[in-house]
UniProtKB/Swiss-Prot annotation:
Uppermost EC category: hydrolase
Keyword vocabulary terms for this entry: Acetylation, Endonuclease, Hydrolase, Metal-binding, Mitochondrion, Nuclease, Phosphoprotein, RNA-binding, Zinc
Subunit structure, interactors included: Monomer.
Keyword Transferase part of the UniProt annotation: no
Localization terms from the record: Mitochondrion matrix
Family (UniProt): Belongs to the metallo-beta-lactamase superfamily. Glyoxalase II family.
EC annotation from Swiss-Prot or TrEMBL: 3.1.27.-
Name listed for the protein in its UniProt record: Endoribonuclease LACTB2
Modified residues (Phosphoserine): S235
GO molecular function: RNA endonuclease activity; single-stranded RNA binding; zinc ion binding
C-alpha cells in the first residue's frame, strides 16, 4: 500500500515538500515539488501538472506559512507532470520580476516553449551551481528517464533531488536503458545520505535504494535472457515476454512493462545477444 503524504510537509530545515495534487498510476501520490532554502526567497524544484488549482492553493499556503517567495524555478525534466504547472504559477503567484525557469536542454537540442511561448527556459549544464540562502544545489546530468533529466545535489545536507530517476516507491520508466544504468552508477558515486524523489516518500537509505534499482534492472535483463536460452529456436514479441516475466504485475501495467522490455531488447540486440525479425510483427530470438 502506498504511503500517505501530507500536501505540505517540512522535511528538513531547508526542504519543504508541496504535493502536486495529481495522484495516479504513474505519479503515485502526485508530483513532489520542493521549496529549497531558508531565506525569504527560495528555489522551487518542479511544478506539477497544468490546471490543478489545489496545487496552486497549496503552494501559496506553503509560501505564506513559511514567510517566503519563489526565487526561481528548476525543472528536473520536460515531462508534463514536472513542467506543466509553470504557467499557472507565473499567472497566479505574484513576483516582483518574471520567474527564471531553469532546466537542461533536450539532447539532441530542440526548441522548447513554456505555455504559449511567453517565457523561455534558461538552460543550465552538468556541474552548474545554483544558490539561494541556506542552500547550494549542484546540477547532475542523469539521462535515461528522459534525454534532458537532471538530479540536484543539496550540498548542505549531502542529499539528492532525484527527479524521476529514482522514485520513493516502486521503479521508474526510462527512454534509454544504457544511459539510465550509467546515470544510476553516477548517482551512486555521490554517496548521498537521503533522496528527495520526484514521486513518493523520502528515501533515507539512499545507497541501498540505488543499488536495488541497479540490481532490479540486471535481474530483469537476466530473466529476458533466460527465456531466450530456454527457448533457443523460438521468437517472442515484447508482450509475450512481459506475460512470461511480469506474472505478478497487474495487467493494466503491462503496457508500461512492455516499454521497459523493449528497451532491454534494444540493448541486448545492440550487444549482439539477440536478433529481431519483423514477419509479420517484430519478434526477437537468441543469437547463435
Amino acid at each position: 500500500m502506498a504511503a500517505t503524504l501530507q500536501r505540505i510537509e517540512r522535511l528538513s530545515s531547508r526542504v519543504i515538500r508541496v504535493l502536486g495534487c495529481n495522484p495516479g498510476p504513474m505519479t503515485l501520490q502526485g508530483t513532489n515539488t520542493y521549496l529549497v532554502g531558508t531565506g525569504p526567497r527560495r528555489i522551487l524544484i518542479d511544478t506539477g501538472e497544468p490546471s490543478i488549482p489545489e496545487y496552486i492553493s497549496c503552494l501559496k499556503q506553503a509560501l505564506t506559512e513559511f514567510n517566503t517567495a519563489i526565487q526561481e524555478i528548476i525543472v528536473t525534466h520536460w515531462h508534463r507532470d514536472h513542467t506543466g504547472g509553470i504557467g499557472d504559477i507565473c499567472k497566479s503567484i505574484n513576483n516582483d520580476t518574471t520567474y527564471c525557469v531553469k532546466k537542461l536542454p533536450r539532447n539532441p537540442e530542440r526548441k522548447e516553449i513554456i505555455g504559449n511561448g511567453e517565457q523561455q527556459y534558461v538552460y543550465v549544464k552538468d556541474g552548474d551551481i545554483i544558490k539561494t540562502e541556506g542552500a547550494t544545489l549542484r546540477v547532475v546530468y542523469t539521462p535515461g528517464h528522459t534525454d534532458d533529466h537532471m538530479a540536484l545535489v543539496l550540498e548542505e545536507e549531502n542529499a539528492l533531488f532525484s527527479g524521476d530517476c529514482i522514485l520513493g516507491e516502486g521503479t521508474t520508466v526510462f527512454e534509454d536503458l544504457y544511459d539510465y544504468m550509467n546515470s544510476l552508477k553516477e548517482l551512486l558515486k555521490i554517496k548521498a545520505k537521503v533522496i528527495y524523489p520526484g514521486h513518493g516518500p523520502v528515501i533515507h537509505n539512499a545507497e541501498a535504494k540505488i543499488l536495488q534499482y541497479i540490481s532490479h534492472r540486471n535481474i530483469r535483463e537476466q530473466q529476458i535472457l533466460t527465456v531466450f536460452h530456454e527457448n533457443f529456436e523460438k521468437s517472442f514479441t515484447a508482450m509475450e515476454l512481459v506475460k512470461s516475466i511480469y506474472k505478478d504485475t497487474p495487467e493494466h501495467l503491462h503496457k508500461m512493462a512492455q516499454h521497459n522490455v523493449l528497451l532491454h531488447l534494444k540493448k541486448l540486440e545492440k550487444e549482439g545477444k539477440i536478433v529481431s525479425n519483423t514477419d509479420p510483427e517484430k519478434k526477437w530470438k537468441a543469437h547463435l
